[in-house]
Swiss-Prot record:
Catalytic activity: Cleavage of hydrophobic, N-terminal signal or leader sequences from secreted and periplasmic proteins
Segments for region (C-terminal short (CTS) helix): 173-184
Protein name: Signal peptidase complex catalytic subunit sec11
Family membership: Belongs to the peptidase S26B family.
Main location: endoplasmic reticulum
Gene name of this polypeptide: sec11
Residue spans, topological domain Lumenal: 26-189
InterPro entries: LexA/Signal_pep-like_sf, Peptidase_S26, Peptidase_S26B
Length: 189
């Protein structure tokens, strides 16, 4: 087994920092472009089956344009500027007393004084979400509660994060495997 020189060790650390900072910058760029604090979320429950399964990775967009009512926006405008939330859209929202975001479909929509108010429901649930809301909230407010609108998904890719959360030993096995891989890779060079 060959010992790494100081320069080789430093180069490895800098390469690792470059990869991590690039991933972080990519995520932050995606956050900026989609106007979402968290543009990627994982479905954690079965409440949206059959539309989404537990472990699906969802991609969100939170751009809320105001189109001229007389003009129907083109497909291009909807892609570039986003589109308003409508009945049937799947949104991700958070409530003040719940740290984990909820993924549900919009079933009722109210417009008042230039604000959009929503009522949501999981596809696999029998009743809407009003019962989950704190007493001070009667509906979801687009500006204060909605984190984003689902624009795409990747099936089951989020199961990795669920497994790492449910079984913490997997984190240590994965980190140990990565460390071992690094040692083996250096031995071969």
């Amino acid at each position: 087994m060959q010992k790494l020189s100081f320069r080789q060790g430093l180069a490895q650390i800098l390469n690792l920092l470059l990869v991590l900072s690039s991933a972080y910058m990519g995520y932050k760029t995606l956050s900026f472009v989609t106007d979402c604090e968290s543009p990627v979320v994982v479905v954690l429950s079965e409440s949206m089956e059959p539309s989404f399964q537990r472990g699906d990775l969802l991609f969100l967009d939170n751009r809320n344009p105001s189109f001229d009512e007389a003009k129907v926006p083109s497909v291009f405008e909807k892609i570039i500027y986003g589109s308003p939330v409508g009945i049937g859209d799947i949104v991700v929202y958070s409530l003040p007393d719940r740290p984990i975001p909820i993924v549900h479909r919009v079933v009722k929509l109210y417009e008042s004084e230039n604000q959009t108010h929503l009522i949501t429901k999981g596809d696999n649930n029998k009743i809407d979400d009003v019962a989950m809301f704190p007493k001070s909230i009667n509906y979801l407010d687009r500006e204060n509660h909605i984190l984003g609108v689902v624009r795409g998904y990747f099936p089951y890719l989020g199961m990795i994060t669920i497994w790492l959360t449910d079984y913490p030993i997997l984190k240590y096995i994965m980190l140990g495997g990565l460390g071992l891989l690094t040692l083996i890779q250096k031995e071969e060079q």
